[in-house]
From Swiss-Prot:
<dbReference type="Pfam" id="PF00736">
    <property type="entry name" value="EF1_GNE"/>
</dbReference>
<dbReference type="InterPro" id="IPR036219">
    <property type="entry name" value="eEF-1beta-like_sf"/>
</dbReference>
<protein>
    <recommendedName>
        <fullName>Elongation factor 1-beta</fullName>
    </recommendedName>
</protein>
<dbReference type="InterPro" id="IPR014038">
    <property type="entry name" value="EF1B_bsu/dsu_GNE"/>
</dbReference>
<dbReference type="InterPro" id="IPR004542">
    <property type="entry name" value="Transl_elong_EF1B_B_arc"/>
</dbReference>
<dbReference type="InterPro" id="IPR014717">
    <property type="entry name" value="Transl_elong_EF1B/ribsomal_bS6"/>
</dbReference>
<keyword id="KW-0648">Protein biosynthesis</keyword>
<keyword id="KW-0251">Elongation factor</keyword>
<comment type="similarity">
    <text>Belongs to the EF-1-beta/EF-1-delta family.</text>
</comment>
<dbReference type="GO" id="GO:0003746">
    <property type="term" value="F:translation elongation factor activity"/>
</dbReference>
<comment type="function">
    <text>Promotes the exchange of GDP for GTP in EF-1-alpha/GDP, thus allowing the regeneration of EF-1-alpha/GTP that could then be used to form the ternary complex EF-1-alpha/GTP/AAtRNA.</text>
</comment>
């Protein structure tokens, strides 16, 4: 079974959000079969920092939609967008 790597940009709803705590919450929200392979940050504007989270999901699981939905349901997340996708 092949896997897909995707970089998801997670925007917190405030610049005051603890990014380490948010990263832990994202990790806990992952659907079965998905795993976080790394996280980086990106300064956006006005003190707001986005998390760039690399997620590995099985290719047969319908892509990144389940992960996007799970991340979007986490408290303090304003939005989730797919930045990059590629097969492993």
């Amino acid at each position: 079974m092949s896997k897909v790597a995707a970089v998801l940009k997670v925007m917190p709803d405030s610049p005051d959000i603890d990014l380490d705590g948010l990263e832990a919450d994202l990790s806990e929200s992952l659907p079965d079969g998905a795993e976080i392979n790394g996280t980086d940050t990106e300064e956006v504007a006005f003190g707001l920092t986005a998390l760039l989270t690399t997620v590995i999901v099985p290719d047969d699981s319908g892509g990144t939609e389940a992960v996007e939905d799970a991340f979007g349901a986490v408290d303090d997340v304003e939005s989730v967008s797919v930045e990059e996708v590629g097969r492993l």
